[in-house]
């Protein structure tokens, strides 16, 4: 079994094989489905606007082209893509071109299986291969699981911006984390 595969036994003790691979544009509908669910149901992404088909393709294409879009899928499932990770532009100014921001999302059924950690590890390597220098994580400060995950992979907390955002009627603090890729 390769480092990007994992066999996980569920309640019925049926082994499922999860595989991480580079995303393609054919994965766009599945990525959009997972991302839009997070838009509706979580505080992880600070927008209430779901992506449509064209918006999802335009957002995903540059990261697919540079090799910093990954998916995790489970063999034999009808909706086999159960998560994704991307490293995309942190800022539009060219001086920030080698600094990217990570985003990792899993469907609820795929959470708690170590797949987020596998995606983050693979994304760090993909970003390194793409020539990126710094990986940034912008995390809702109350999301301790995400903060701990990033710490495990060498990210340090740069700071917390109080009251940086708002979603679902809640005022949210933002934890900024970074990791060198060199």
Annotate each predicted stretch with a short phrase.
Residues 3-4, 25, 49-109, 120-121, ...:
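Acetyl-CoA-dependent GNAT
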Residues 5-7, 98, 153, 163-182:
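C-terminal "cap" of GNAT-fold acetyltransferases
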Residues 19-33:
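A short beta-loop-alpha structural element at the N-terminal edge
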Residues 32-59:
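Conserved GNAT-fold acetyl-CoA-binding loop/helix
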Residues 111, 137-147:
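Conserved beta-strand-loop-alpha-helix junction that forms the acyl-donor binding cleft
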Residues 127-139:
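Conserved GNAT acetyl-CoA-binding A-motif
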């Amino acid at each position: 079994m390769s480092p990007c595969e994992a066999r996980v036994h569920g309640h019925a003790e049926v082994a499922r094989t999860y595989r991480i691979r580079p995303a393609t544009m054919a994965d766009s509908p599945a990525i959009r489905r997972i991302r839009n669910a997070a838009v509706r149901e979580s505080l992880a992404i600070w927008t209430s606007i779901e992506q449509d088909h064209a918006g999802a393709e335009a957002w995903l294409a540059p990261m697919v082209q540079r090799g910093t879009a990954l998916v995790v899928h489970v063999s034999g499932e009808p909706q086999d893509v159960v998560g994704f990770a991307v490293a995309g532009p942190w800022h539009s100014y060219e001086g920030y071109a080698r600094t990217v921001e990570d985003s990792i999302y899993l469907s609820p059924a795929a959470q708690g299986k170590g797949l987020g950690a596998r995606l983050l590890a693979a994304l760090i390597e993909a970003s390194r291969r793409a020539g990126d220098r710094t990986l940034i994580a912008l995390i809702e400060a109350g999301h301790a699981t995400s903060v701990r995950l990033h710490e495990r992979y060498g990210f340090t907390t740069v700071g917390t911006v109080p009251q940086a955002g708002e979603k679902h009627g809640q005022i949210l603090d933002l934890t900024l984390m970074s990791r060198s890729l060199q």
